[in-house]
């Protein structure tokens, strides 16, 4: 069981790292972008194969507000990733060129907003499962964090603030709704700064969904105790 959990964590970390790299497609060769995309797709399929119990439990049990939120985010993430995969095949110049598709125009219109929605939903998904990560860390350390917790909280606030700034500054919110045709690509920025910016954007959505989940949990407890 521990081995399976370790594999799950490894797959999730690899997916997140690959997704971050893929967001910087303008910094890499197009052929590499396509093959890394295929690797990300395979990891996504493996992730669902390892979490088969989620599919089996969809129609079981009661749906609290928290479970509705979690399920909605997960389903939307699956749909957005499916759109990313389909549009990737449509715009492919290398890996799927043998298919002879002539749908690049339509594929481009779908690919960027689908990717951006998937990116945001990955952050939301991480946040809704973040309590499990924190519990595992607490069990491992077996001590109260104290000053370390306060420092991490300050770091989180800074990361969320920076992520919010980057999300607005880069106009990523506009890409969610196709409010502009061209993506904001700064070819002069360094790779470390780009990765730091997008990690902060993920932190923004992760923190948002984590604290929303906590709010729904506390609300449920207060209703039960009333």
PLM regions: where:
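Membrane-embedded alpha-helical bundles that constitute the cytochrome b-like, heme-associated redox core
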Residues: 1-226
């Amino acid at each position: 069981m521990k081995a399976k959990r370790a594999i799950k964590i490894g797959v999730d970390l690899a997916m997140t790292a690959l997704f971050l790299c893929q967001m910087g497609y303008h910094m890499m060769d197009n052929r590499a972008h396509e093959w890394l995309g295929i690797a990300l797709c395979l990891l996504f399929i493996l992730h669902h194969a390892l979490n088969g119990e989620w599919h089996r439990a969809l129609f079981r049990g009661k749906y609290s507000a928290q479970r509705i939120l979690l399920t909605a985010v997960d389903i939307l993430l699956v749909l957005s990733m499916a759109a990313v995969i389909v549009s990737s095949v449509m715009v492919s110049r290398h890996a799927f060129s043998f298919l002879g598709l002539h749908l690049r125009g339509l594929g481009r219109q779908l690919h960027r907003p689908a990717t951006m929605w998937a990116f945001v939903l990955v952050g939301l998904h991480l946040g809704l499962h973040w309590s499990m990560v924190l519990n595992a860390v607490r069990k491992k350390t077996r001590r109260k964090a104290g000053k370390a917790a306060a420092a991490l909280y300050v770091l989180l606030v800074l990361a969320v603030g920076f992520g919010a700034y980057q999300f607005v500054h880069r106009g990523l919110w506009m890409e969610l709704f196709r409010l502009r045709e061209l993506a904001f690509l700064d070819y002069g920025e360094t790779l470390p700064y780009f990765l730091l910016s997008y990690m902060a954007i993920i932190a923004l959505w992760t923190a948002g969904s984590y604290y929303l989940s906590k709010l729904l949990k506390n609300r449920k407890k207060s209703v039960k105790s009333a």
